[in-house]
A protein has these predicted regions:
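Active-site loop signature of alpha/beta-hydrolase-fold enzymes
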Residues: 24, 69, 173
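Short beta-strand segments at enzyme active-site cores
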Residues: 18, 59-66, 71, 167
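Short acidic, Gly/Ser-rich segments with clustered Asp/Glu that frequently serve as metal-coordination loops
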Residues: 22-28
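Active-site-adjacent betaalpha module
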Residues: 1-15, 52-57, 81-210
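A short, N-terminal amphipathic alpha-helix
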Residues: 42-60
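N-terminal nucleotide-binding beta1-loop-alpha1 segment
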Residues: 15-21
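Short, flexible, mixed-charge acidic loops at enzyme active sites
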Residues: 29-31, 74-80
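Short glycine-enriched, charge-decorated loop/helix-capping segments at active-site entrances
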Residues: 31-40
Length: 210
């Protein structure tokens, strides 16, 4: 895995995409407390470890967040997921709920893309165009959730001809067993499944050389 991962995740063509790592989703006062607790147990600490090493190696970091107007104008109302937590948290642009968690940045070299609709950033933002402009062909997907958004971005990215890496200890879903089943039975057929430590080892070899 190490040699193959080194080529697949080479900094020159790789970006980390963080998915909904924002206050309203996995912060201390998140709308879905169970998901936030699960994400903060393992995934968030590992993402926090991963990003500085990735940046130092020259890997791009793109944060994908979700935002809504208080009246929901222009946002989806056509699935149950969009009603969960409605009114309990504020994801108005510029609020803590709609902002990347401070422990993750954003740093000056990071990009932040926010969406108004949908369940994933490929269809709801300029993510595809931005990644292509950056020369990215491999995406490392981290964040939440394994229930919906992570499978969505993995499938969309594969359909758009990207190679995808999923560090299994830097993504989260509920219940934990379901998240693991999604990784083992679905995402493993679409993406390279690895760990935070394996990526850190790979990128540490590039530190200061990009």
């Amino acid at each position: 895995m190490t040699d193959r991962l080194a080529g697949l995740a080479a900094p020159g063509h790789t970006a980390i995409v963080t998915q909904e790592c924002q206050g309203a989703v996995i912060g201390p006062n998140a709308g879905l407390a169970q998901l936030a607790e699960e994400a903060r147990r393992e995934a968030l600490p590992n993402i926090t470890r991963m990003l500085p090493v990735a940046r130092a190696a020259g890997v791009r970091v793109v944060h994908c967040t979700v935002q809504r107007r208080p009246d929901g104008l222009g946002a989806n109302h056509n699935a149950k997921i969009f009603a969960i937590g409605r009114g309990e948290v504020n994801i108005l642009p510029g609020t803590p709920g709609a902002t990347v968690l401070p422990e993750l940045g954003p740093e000056p070299t990071d990009l932040v893309l926010s969406r108004w609709h949908g369940v994933g950033p490929m269809g709801g933002t300029d993510l595809d165009a931005v990644l292509r402009n950056l020369g990215v062909s491999t995406i490392v997907v981290v964040g939440v959730s394994l229930n919906i958004a992570i499978p969505n971005i993995v499938m969309d990215a594969v359909n758009a001809a990207y190679r995808v890496i999923v560090p299994r200890d830097a993504v989260a879903g509920i219940p934990t067993e379901y998240g693991n089943a999604i990784i083992d039975n679905t995402l493993s057929l679409l993406a390279t499944i690895t760990s935070t430590d394996e990526l850190l080892h790979t990128w540490s070899q590039h530190k200061g050389t990009s």
